[in-house]
Amino acid sequence: MTADLPATVIGCSNLIVRGGRYLLVQESKEPARSLFNLPAGKPELGETLAEAAVREAREETGLDVQVEYLVAIYHCPRTSEGVGVVNFVFRSTVAGGMLRTSTEHPAVGYFSREEIAELGRAGRLRGVHVELAVDQCAAGTRLPMGTVQLIACAPSPSPAGSQREQG
C-alpha cells in the first residue's frame, strides 16, 4: 500500500445489455490505457453503491441507467497497483440518454460474449472480472439487492472508563 492509496478500494460496475451484447468502455488513463472495462467507478462520500453505478454510467457513457439487481461481488486482495478492490457489479438497464465517448473513454460499444472473450485472450480487458461478470449475467445470476445493507453510521460510544472521574 502506498501513502496515497487506501488499503482497499470499493468499485461499482454496470452490466448494460442490449440484444445480447454488453456495453464496454475503453480506458484512456494509465495503468489501464487502451483496456476495455465495464462502465465503473468509485462511490463518492454519502453515495450508495447503486447511486454510484448510475452516476458512473452517465459520466462514462452518456446513458441514464436504472440499477435492476446485483450480479456479483468480487474481491481482489491485491491488484497490480498495490491496493485491494471489492467490486459490486450491477445489472442496469438504459432509461435514457445518448451513448457517447469522452476524453477518459475514447471508445464505447456493445460487444458479444465471444468478442469479450477475444479481448480477454488478447490481454485487452481491465481485468478478469469483466468476463466473469458477463458470464454470470448470461447464466442468470441474480443476487438480492438486500445483499448489501445500507446502515446509518453513528459515532462510536465512548470507551468505558474514559469519563472524567468525580473527585
Residue ranges of model-derived segments:
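Active-site-adjacent beta-strand/loop module that shapes the phosphate/pyrophosphate-binding cleft
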Residues: H75-M98, G109, E115, V134-C137
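A short coil-to-beta-strand element that immediately follows conserved catalytic motifs
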Residues: D64-A72
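Short connector loops at helix/strand junctions that flank enzyme active sites
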Residues: V9, V17, L38, V65, ...
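Nudix hydrolase/Nudix homology domain
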Residues: P31, E104-G167
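A generic structural micro-feature
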Residues: D4-T8, L35, S80-V86, S102-H105
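A structural signal for short, well-ordered beta-strand segments
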Residues: N14, L70, F90-S92
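Conserved Nudix-box catalytic region and its N-terminal flanking loop in Nudix hydrolases
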Residues: R18-E59, G167
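Conserved N-terminal beta-strand and adjoining loop/helix that marks the start
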Residues: M1-L23, Y74
